[in-house]
């Protein structure tokens, strides 16, 4: 988060993650210096909800069926996410959960965030660890269906860094969330297959652990047994991609002083090269006064169209609330997205009418100010 550039984070396709591990939607960004946050986890913009009203239709249990996701959160498989059991298990991940933050009911639904403090990866073709600082964003809709986004970094046994975003959905009542990994690995070498293989999996969470089992469904037979998910009508959808916006800066709202860890790279991956700068804490002053939690990062992407910043992290105001943040875009055109409880003092942040300064020098990292958008 100290310098810049600007490039899209997710290429091609509609909202969500693409079938061959290419997440779709607009471009997210990462740049040398930018703090960004999360607008949720779907494929559409954070505007109007889907037209459906029920959590699912079809089979009452979606464990062995193909799940057809709501158009707002397709995970790159709009025609249906196959049952993992129809494929071949390729690797498993055990994540350690260090904390769970209940954000409350936000503009999108009931949100909680699980902090990942590490983990292990086991499989014949992939072994290694999961770095601390991962984020698991779980959204429960008013109809009981669930949507998920996870942001993780794998470190293989031969010291290769791999960037992972998991997109997930579940019908009301399902304990396991069906996930589609969007993986950015070096395009040459022994992990290039992760960029293009059609992978799906399951995510099961307990109080202190998340288990991911990932399957290759490239040769899975087509299924006519389907469960169709529909988001509640009249509710905004979260966005898989960065939110855009234009305008001029008005009054300042609050300022962050963000502490940063040592950066590392995911080089020559399918979308370009990522410079990942861990967020290790910080403070906020102004209308949001408190601290920045340790976790998340600025996942900067340098690609063919330039460098973009994509910072994901969480604010903890001094009154005990939590605010999820995603600050995205080219360094001089950052647009933040916030997610706060609709019955709390920071619900005004959910309106999406804000702009961000470029990152400047700060104590131990960078300083960023957010402004009302005129």
Locate each region found by the language model.
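Ser/Thr-rich, Pro/Gly/Ala-heavy low-complexity intrinsically disordered linkers and tails
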Residues: 1-66
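Beta-strand-enriched cores of mature, soluble protein domains
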Residues: 67-374
